[in-house]
Amino acid sequence: MEIRTATMADLPAIAQLEAVCFPAAEAATEASFARRLEAYPNHFWVLINGETIVSFVNGLVTNEPDLQDDMYDNAALHDENGAWQMIFGVDTHPDYRRQGCAGKLLEHVIRQAKAQGRKGLVLTCKDKLVPYYAKFGFLSEGISQSTHGDVIWYQMRLTL
């Protein structure tokens, strides 16, 4: 399996994988992914098995220290020189879960953020995933201000 940055040609497969991984109220749309790919293609990574995208991670870079709901759909908030790498989604196809795919991608993104001199990475997750992200050094900051999808999210931060 290999990691590379996503391209517009990947858009249909990315949108399809998102629909498999998240309920409609939480899932990003294909149009939102297109805006993200246009604005920050170097911050959208896919894990490929042969020709198949099995996992992806994406998110903008900003000087804002906390992940905010408007960041998901407003790609113009990306600041390539920003201090914080936001992580909007860690999607892995169900057939590839519990095989280290998401971890491989997260480790890659963390290395990229270090190499780019970021202060760290921020993501939000459901409570059941807090221990998973803690394995990578993320610390829980408690319940996020996010109301995305009418779900309770926990903000996690990895300071580099």
Predicted regions, residues:
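A short beta-loop-alpha structural element at the N-terminal edge
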Residues: 1-14
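Hydrophobic adenine-recognition pocket in adenosine-nucleotide-binding enzymes
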Residues: 6, 90-92
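Active-site rim helix/loop that mediates acceptor-substrate recognition in acyltransferases
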Residues: 24-50, 58-77
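Conserved acyl-donor/pantetheine-binding loop and adjacent beta-alpha core of acyl/acetyltransferases
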Residues: 56-90, 97, 147-153
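Conserved catalytic-core motifs of GNAT/GCN5-like acyltransferases
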Residues: 61-64, 124, 134, 139-155
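Residue-level recognition of the GNAT/N-acetyltransferase active site
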Residues: 93, 126
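Conserved acetyl-CoA pyrophosphate-binding loop and the N-cap/start of the following alpha-helix
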Residues: 96-108
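Conserved GNAT acetyl-CoA-binding A-motif
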Residues: 106, 111-125
